[in-house]
A protein has these predicted regions:
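Residue-level recognition of beta-strand->loop/alpha-helix junctions
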Residues: 55-59, 83, 226, 353-355, ...
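Short glycine-rich His-centered loop
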Residues: 3-31
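Radical SAM enzyme core and accessory elements
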Residues: 2-5, 69, 196, 395-398, ...
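Radical SAM [4Fe-4S] cluster-binding motif and immediate context
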Residues: 178, 183-350, 357, 367-370
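Short helix-capping segments at alpha-helix termini
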Residues: 100-105, 126, 148, 276-283, ...
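Glycine-rich beta-alpha loop elements in corrinoid/cobalamin-binding modules
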Residues: 38-173, 394
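Flexible glycine/acidic-rich beta-alpha junction loops that bind and position SAM and/or redox cofactors
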Residues: 13-16, 118, 265-266, 321, ...
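Catalytic cores of alpha/beta
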Residues: 120-123, 299, 359-374
């Protein structure tokens, strides 16, 4: 079989679509391309199974629609796989309708939006299959191998049989992640994602996932809890083996482990000690997502010794009421303590905040602004990111707000973080965006600038700060 895994180009006056490997979609004024781990794994699985594979990211490759279409249809695919998210699903419906006029290929949709609402896309466009859940790479391999025999389909597949839409039931996350191959980086054009990424201080960089996806998996706003309601990990030694290959074969200098939360406990200890034993800590830097409240100062010290550079935490708000409503299982005081410990251990700390909660007003937002700026001024946070609260379909937050009449619209185009879609009776949209800008301006505080200056060690740092300044300007533009 001939299988194309694609991201059609998206021309928009709003900016560049940040679609791949992204839990929250945004249009960016400055291009940012994130390596898509699961799609790349799917491509590798299919190639190893003997199929011909085209991996075509029209966004990251910056192809024109004409160039993209020409390359895709010259490949003559039997299957075309498209990952979608809520803010662009209507664009993908239109693209699929046009694609079906040009080719007899079966079109497959994947992603968190169609996992939450599979019936919708089956009704709104002539898509042939929808693969639900986060293990769609395994499902795609099964689908192609089944060659149209629905009796062989695994759970989680939606399909058409004559004029009837059918499905194989709820998806199951029972695949062994150690059975997934190491990604064929050449097949998926890894270099497209190696530099235009604000997280990387050193380049070239790339991504892996040691786990799928987060061991908490209860945050009510997170779209990936729809894909991954449970948690599994790869073998720690196998992960180190892959990292060693990436360093030796591709010269990778920085690695982002984009598991929703990096595995902790014995897994983390084994991983760090093996990285140190092989001397990989002297050859690359490692970034990861983490949650507050699980690691001690000694854990951060071990991570730093193992070559970790950046740890990303989701804070979302400095108001305990909001953290509790989001089921963050987090206390505000844990944030300060965790940031201080990580910084003291020599790690850079990146924080994410969200604004535009239905129950927060100017006073609560000001509290979060003060908190974020304090962490920057103390040097306990190196970087941070602010976004609007977007309740994605399938999340508990979406269900809560929809039931309470708390949504401005169900027009998915509007869920792109350009404006608030949540009704905020206690704060205007202008006040919300002003709060976000106040946080970003916290980077320009004298104490924050001083910490940045005193932490400068190499030319890589200077290049990173320059890219960071451009990102800061871009964020101020994005939320003006």
């Amino acid at each position: 079989m001939r299988v194309a895994i694609v991201y059609p180009p998206m021309k928009s006056e709003k900016g560049v679509a940040l679609l791949t490997q992204n839990r929250q979609f945004q249009w960016f004024s400055r291009p940012t391309y994130i390596f898509p781990v699961v799609p790349a794994t799917a491509a590798t699985m299919l190639k190893k199974a003997g199929h011909e594979v085209l991996f075509l990211d029209g966004i990251a490759s910056e192809k024109t629609p004409e160039e993209f279409e020409s390359e895709l249809w010259e490949f003559s695919p039997d299957y075309v796989v498209v990952e979608t998210k809520t803010p662009v699903v209507k664009r993908h419906w239109k693209w699929i309708a046009e694609a079906k006029k040009k080719s007899s290929a079966s079109i497959v949709l994947v992603g968190d939006h169609v996992t939450a609402l599979p019936e919708e896309s089956m009704a709104q466009c002539p898509v042939d299959f929808i693969l639900t859940g986060g293990d769609w790479d395994f499902l795609l391999k099964n689908l192609v191998a089944s060659d149209g025999d629905a009796s062989k389909y695994e759970s989680g597949i939606w399909y058409r049989e004559n004029a009837e839409v059918k499905n194989t039931g709820r998806f199951k996350l029972d695949h062994n992640l150690n059975d997934a191959p190491w990604i064929d980086r050449d097949l998926v054009h890894w270099e497209l994602y190696a530099k235009k990424n604000g997280n990387f201080r050193r380049t070239p960089g790339t991504y892996i996932m040691s786990g799928r996806d987060c061991w908490h998996a209860k945050c009510t706003f997170c779209s990936w809890t729809t894909l991954y309601p449970t948690y599994r990990t790869r073998d720690a030694i196998d992960v180190v083996d892959e990292i060693e290959m990436l360093v030796e074969k591709y010269g990778i200098r920085e690695l982002m482990d984009d598991s929703g939360s990096l595995p902790v406990g014995a897994w983390l200890e084994t991983f760090c000690n093996e990285i140190i034993r092989r001397g990989l800590n002297k050859k690359l830097r490692i970034d990861c997502n983490m949650r507050f409240g699980r690691l001690k100062y000694e854990d951060y010290l071990l991570m730093r010794k193992a070559g970790f550079r950046l740890v990303l935490f989701g804070v979302e708000s400095a108001n305990q009421k909001t953290l509790d409503r989001f089921v963050k299982a987090l206390k505000v005081e844990d944030v300060e303590k965790g940031c201080e410990w990580a910084h003291k251990a020599g790690l850079d700390v990146h924080l994410t905040f969200m604004f535009g909660h239905a129950w927060e007003g100017p006073e609560e937002m000001a509290n979060t602004v003060r908190f974020a700026r304090k962490l920057l001024a103390n040097g306990w946070a190196s970087t941070l990111q602010c976004t609007l609260t977007i309740p994605y379909p399938g999340t508990p937050l979406f269900k809560e707000l929809e039931a309470a009449g708390g949504l401005h619209t169900l027009d998915w185009d509007e869920y792109d973080m350009r404006r608030a879609v949540t009704r905020t009776p206690l704060a205007s949209e202008a006040e919300i965006k002003c709060a976000i800008q106040q946080v970003y301006r916290g980077f320009l505080q004298p104490r924050a600038l001083w910490h940045r200056f005193t932490s400068t060690r190499t030319l890589f740092d200077l290049g990173f700060y320059y890219r960071g300044l451009r990102s800061l300007i871009g964020h101020l533009v994005d939320f003006k």
